């Protein structure tokens, strides 16, 4: 049986899709909440991973080992880095990077975990499906590009500019995607990140995040709905 894995970090990021699912069965493993059911005619496992890279890595490992999904979509909110994007707009990964990893002293690239790729490539078919879904979610614009992950909420303008200097091509940042991508890489499971902006990094981010998290979660969920409808 083919299953699709959907991963969001927080209650707010998984609530919309959870409400749309049918025949839902909840299972908790090691503190990670899995919601198994049907969505848009597909068998899905919706995972609430918890916030941050360690939580994301642990829960994604459990998802892949216990449920063996065909592919994984990382959903939820992000902080915008691309100046053309606004709160509520969508970002789709073509690559994902750990923006806070630095082992350059041993010859690795900035963001590269030793013996891992410098960036993690999203599955091209899933990226194309996300772009196609965008045509049906008309209230947002989107960018496809590099998404950066770090264990910090990016509300400090100085830190934002430091990260931007290292990765000028970043379209958005968040706190889980590279961990999800790294685990998917090790398992050989295709993935893509489809998130919506809850804030613009460095610009009153905490206030914007609280206010627009629901909007971001809804827009991200609408994208996933259209992706699954198209399959």
Swiss-Prot record:
Record-level Gene Ontology MF annotations: adenosylhomocysteine nucleosidase activity; methylthioadenosine nucleosidase activity
UniProt keyword list: Amino-acid biosynthesis, Hydrolase, Methionine biosynthesis
Keyword Amino-acid biosynthesis in annotation: yes
Gene Ontology BP annotations: L-methionine salvage from methylthioadenosine; L-methionine salvage from S-adenosylmethionine; nucleoside catabolic process
Reactions catalysed according to its record: S-adenosyl-L-homocysteine + H2O = S-(5-deoxy-D-ribos-5-yl)-L-homocysteine + adenine; S-methyl-5'-thioadenosine + H2O = 5-(methylsulfanyl)-D-ribose + adenine; 5'-deoxyadenosine + H2O = 5-deoxy-D-ribose + adenine
InterPro entries attached to this UniProt entry: MTA_SAH_Nsdase, Nucleoside_phosphorylase_d, Nucleoside_phosphorylase_sf
Top-level EC class as recorded in UniProt: hydrolase
Family: Belongs to the PNP/UDP phosphorylase family. MtnN subfamily.
UniProt-listed PANTHER family: 5'-METHYLTHIOADENOSINE/S-ADENOSYLHOMOCYSTEINE NUCLEOSIDASE, 5'-METHYLTHIOADENOSINE_S-ADENOSYLHOMOCYSTEINE NUCLEOSIDASE
Biological role stated in the UniProt entry: Catalyzes the irreversible cleavage of the glycosidic bond in both 5'-methylthioadenosine (MTA) and S-adenosylhomocysteine (SAH/AdoHcy) to adenine and the corresponding thioribose, 5'-methylthioribose and S-ribosylhomocysteine, respectively. Also cleaves 5'-deoxyadenosine, a toxic by-product of radical S-adenosylmethionine (SAM) enzymes, into 5-deoxyribose and adenine.
Protein name: 5'-methylthioadenosine/S-adenosylhomocysteine nucleosidase
């Amino acid at each position: 049986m083919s299953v699709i894995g959907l991963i969001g970090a927080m209650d707010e990021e998984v609530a919309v899709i959870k409400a749309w699912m049918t025949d839902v069965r909840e299972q908790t493993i090691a503190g990670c909440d899995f919601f198994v059911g049907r969505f848009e005619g597909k068998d899905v496992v919706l995972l609430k991973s918890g916030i941050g890279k360690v939580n994301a890595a642990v829960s994604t490992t459990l998802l892949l080992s216990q449920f063996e999904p065909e592919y994984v979509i990382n959903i939820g909110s992000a902080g915008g880095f691309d100046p053309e994007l606004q709160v509520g707009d969508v970002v789709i990964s073509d690559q994902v990077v750990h923006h806070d990893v630095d082992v350059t002293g041993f010859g690795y690239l900035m963001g590269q975990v030793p013996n891992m790729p410098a960036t993690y490539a999203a599955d091209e078919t899933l990226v194309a499906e996300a772009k196609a879904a965008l045509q049906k979610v008309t209230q947002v614009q989107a960018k496809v590009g590099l998404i950066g992950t770090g264990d910090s909420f990016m509300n400090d303008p100085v830190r934002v500019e430091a990260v931007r200097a290292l990765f000028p091509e970043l379209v958005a940042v968040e706190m889980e995607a590279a961990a999800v991508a790294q685990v998917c890489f090790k398992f050989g499971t295709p993935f893509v990140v489809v998130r919506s902006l809850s804030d613009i990094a460095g610009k009153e981010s905490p206030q914007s995040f609280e206010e627009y998290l629901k909007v971001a979660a809804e827009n991200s969920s609408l994208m996933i709905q259209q992706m699954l409808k198209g399959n």
